[in-house]
């Protein structure tokens, strides 16, 4: 009964994220109700205040009264694309305008409260894996620096999880967000409603803004733990952005994961980092303002260490889907896409759908690939066939003609775009800020390029 209540309440809170703003907020004297007002407030904040002050930044977001939300998917994605194009690298201002324009489906408070359970990193998982997976599931595994209790608490297992009757599918989040909120309204929803996979959400503390090497510990443990409580059935992973990097690091240094992962599916990944990393933290000393962003600079020491000695290639069957219109990760065009790995099925949406068809159009940016029909078709194909996905097995013509994957609704798109303001505020809130990337862990120092 306890878990059913959580599911019901969680669904209610998620629905609340697309509700109208509360009358109290709209009536506040300091409510922000126009773009001109918002621009003035942000300019004043940056010129006269402390642009790194999380409390001031949060107060701005909480004052924003969303205007009438778009009435169609086409209007929603076009509006968000216009905002991100107008504010290149300014994730805070883009997030604010997404809230104001109604593209996130609700107020900032609505959004934060919508996924209290699926976004939790304080879960109670009492089942014990067999055989034990901590401190090592394989003698060759890298050592953990995080306690088993913390690693396990980050795993949110939804009500109805079948413990191996369906293939477990671990969702790995990107920078600045949690897994549940990132996926529950797109790929997570679609696979929950399918007989193919059983979603599990890995909610890494600090929103994947800390050291990615630590994030990889959460991934490595989650893979072994979920397999160990699911009859030792292999699991698969579906990751967004930096989640793909933490997953690849886990596969490289936790040998036990290679035997436990059936498929690795990456959406908008950045295995080579991104030339835009420095733009995500204006006002901070470069190359980064949080450890993870510093690590994701194109050709950072972390990235070069990951890619060296085999990390630029697959360890398990891998499918990567990405878009040239990604506003966060670049380069993202073949043959130099950051999302590409040697030996993987690497699919640039525009090379298949062209930019003319909906499946490859301009609105397929960093978050848009999460509800892209071809991306979902390829993920489904990978999970239902041996090896990685194959374009020859999917109906690419049909998928490219669709605006979003079947089953995705307008509120789902709102909830997906709501991750941008969440990430923006998480970046500002993260402490301590850094001027350089963390040192490479001792177990990986042998792979630092000379």
Language-model segments: which ranges?
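Flexible, membrane-associating and regulatory peripheral segments of lipid-active enzymes
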Residues: 3, 15-171, 397-399, 411-450
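Short, surface-exposed "cap/lid" segments of acyl-processing enzymes
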Residues: 148-203
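The conserved beta1-alpha1 loop
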Residues: 170-174, 203, 240-241, 268, ...
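Short alpha-helix in the alpha/beta-hydrolase fold that links the catalytic acid
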Residues: 184-185, 330-337
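Catalytic histidine neighborhood in serine/cysteine hydrolases
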Residues: 198, 341-362
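Catalytic nucleophile-loop/oxyanion-hole region of alpha/beta-hydrolase
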Residues: 204-221
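Serine-dependent carboxylesterase/thioesterase catalytic core
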Residues: 216-312
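Short beta-strand/loop motif that positions the catalytic acidic residue
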Residues: 314, 320-322, 326
């Amino acid at each position: 009964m306890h878990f059913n209540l959580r599911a019901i309440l969680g669904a209610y809170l998620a629905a609340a994220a697309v509700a109208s703003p509360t009358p109290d907020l709209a009536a506040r004297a300091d409510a922000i109700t126009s773009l001109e007002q918002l621009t003035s407030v942000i300019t004043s904040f940056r010129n006269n205040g402390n642009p790194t002050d999380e409390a001031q930044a949060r107060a701005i977001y909480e004052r924003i009264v969303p205007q009438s939300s778009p009435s169609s998917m086409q209007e929603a994605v076009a509006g968000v694309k216009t905002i991100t194009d107008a504010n290149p690298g300014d994730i805070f201002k883009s997030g604010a305008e997404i809230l104001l324009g109604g593209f996130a489906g609700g107020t900032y408070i609505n959004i934060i409260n919508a996924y209290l359970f699926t976004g939790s990193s304080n879960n109670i998982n009492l089942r014990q894996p067999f055989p034990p997976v901590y401190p090592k599931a394989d003698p060759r595994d890298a050592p953990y620096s995080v306690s088993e209790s913390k690693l396990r608490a980050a795993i949110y297992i939804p009500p109805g999880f079948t413990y191996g009757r369906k293939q477990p599918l671990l969702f790995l989040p990107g920078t600045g967000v949690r897994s549940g909120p990132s996926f529950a309204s797109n790929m997570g929803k679609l696979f929950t409603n399918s007989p193919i996979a059983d979603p599990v959400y890995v909610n890494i503390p600090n929103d994947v803004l800390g050291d990615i090497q630590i994030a990889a510990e959460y991934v490595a443990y989650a893979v072994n733990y979920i397999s160990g409580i699911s009859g030792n059935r292999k699991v698969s992973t579906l990751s967004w952005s930096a989640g793909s990097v933490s997953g690849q690091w886990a596969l490289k240094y936790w040998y036990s994961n290679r035997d436990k992962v059936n498929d690795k599916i990456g959406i908008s990944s950045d295995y080579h980092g991104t030339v835009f990393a420095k733009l995500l933290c204006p006002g901070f000393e470069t190359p980064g303002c949080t450890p993870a962003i510093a690590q994701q600079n194109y050709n950072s020491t972390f990235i070069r260490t990951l890619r060296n000695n085999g990390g630029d290639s697959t360890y398990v069957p891998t499918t990567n889907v990405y878009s040239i219109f990604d506003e966060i990760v670049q380069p993202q065009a073949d043959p130099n896409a950051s999302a590409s790995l040697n030996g993987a099925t690497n699919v640039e949406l525009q090379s298949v759908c062209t930019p003319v068809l909906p499946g490859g159009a301009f609105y397929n940016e960093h978050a848009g690939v999460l509800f892209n029909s071809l991306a979902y078709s390829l993920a489904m194909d990978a999970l239902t066939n041996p090896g990685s996905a194959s374009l020859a097995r999917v109906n690419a013509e049909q998928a490219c003609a669709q605006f979003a994957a079947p089953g995705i609704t307008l509120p789902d798109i709102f909830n997906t775009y709501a991750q941008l303001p969440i990430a923006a505020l998480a970046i500002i809130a993260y402490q301590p800020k850094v001027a350089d990337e963390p040192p490479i862990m001792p177990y990986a120092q042998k792979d630092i390029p000379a």
